[in-house]
A protein has these predicted regions:
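Charged, compositionally biased N-terminal leader segments and the immediate start
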Residues: 1-24
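N-terminal glycine-rich anion-binding loops that anchor highly charged ligand groups
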Residues: 3, 10-13, 36-50
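Positively charged, low-complexity intrinsically disordered leader regions
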Residues: 26-29, 33-34
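Cofactor-binding active-site loop characterized by glycine-rich and histidine/acidic residues
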Residues: 43-46, 50-176, 194-200, 205, ...
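Short, ordered loop/turn segments at secondary-structure junctions
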Residues: 88, 185-188, 220-221
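A positional/architectural concept
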Residues: 170, 180-182, 186
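Short, proline-centered helix/strand-breaking motifs
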Residues: 179-180, 214
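Structural signature of the thiamine diphosphate
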Residues: 224-226
């Protein structure tokens, strides 16, 4: 059996130490904008959670602790790239120029709140676990056929890796070499199911190897690594 290794990337550790050799080339203004967005989505998340507890929102799924993963990836994309979010991606939408009032509109029960802003390819939030993965693979294939430079990024939790849609999408993207990025936000629990009961694989990232493309493990709380 061929040996394999899954790379782990961390640039900024939990103590604020930065590996300058890996640091992306960002201006001070760009770093400031990223930091401001991290604060904005954190404050939004807490406010929306409070509103839900007050009965002012019907449902709301928090993303506390996952801000860097969503903001960092959003800043790395172009507006014309596709994103396929899950229910825990309100911060991602805001970072992708989705008006806050519309995000609250959606969580208040009005699906029109998910209408993508002009010139930004934000697809609607997927509530069923893992269904957005096949949509993302399809969009990536469409971009390849059209010859554009767009990429398709789909967001999901580790629980989605136990779903059939996930495997179909990964296999399709691998076979046809579609420009898709499968971004798993592993928060260690799929609602109530712990990570250890989802898979026997040592990492989620290594699943990519079986489908013929690269997988990398990244510190999701390190915005620069993301």
């Amino acid at each position: 059996m061929k040996d394999f290794k899954v790379e782990y990337l961390q640039i900024l550790d939990e103590n604020g130490n930065c590996d300058d050799t890996l640091m992306p080339k960002l201006s001070n203004d760009e770093i400031k904008k990223i930091y401001e967005m991290l604060i904005l989505v954190r404050v939004f998340d807490q406010k929306a959670f409070n509103m839900q507890r007050q009965g002012r929102l019907g449902t709301y799924i928090q993303f506390k602790g996952q801000e860097a993963c969503q903001v960092g990836s959003a800043f790395a994309l172009h507006d014309e790239d596709f994103i396929f979010p899950m229910y825990r991606n309100s911060g991602l939408l805001i970072a992708r120029k989705h008006p806050i009032v519309q995000v609250l509109q959606y969580w208040g029960g009005d699906e029109r709140g998910l209408k993508s802003p002009p010139n930004v390819n934000n697809f609607p939030i997927a509530i069923p676990v893992g269904t957005q993965t096949v949509h993302a693979a399809g969009a990536a294939m469409a971009a390849k056929l059209r010859g554009t430079k767009q990429v398709s990024v789909v967001y999901f939790g580790e629980g989605a890796t136990s779903k059939g849609d996930f495997h179909e999408a990964m296999n399709f993207a691998g076979v046809f070499q579609a420009p898709a990025i499968f971004l798993c936000e592993n928060n260690q629990f799929a609602i109530s199911v712990p990570r250890k009961d989802q898979t026997r694989a040592e990492t989620i990232a290594q699943k990519a190897i079986a489908y013929g493309f690269e997988g990398i493990q990244v510190d999701g709380m390190d915005v620069f690594a993301v």
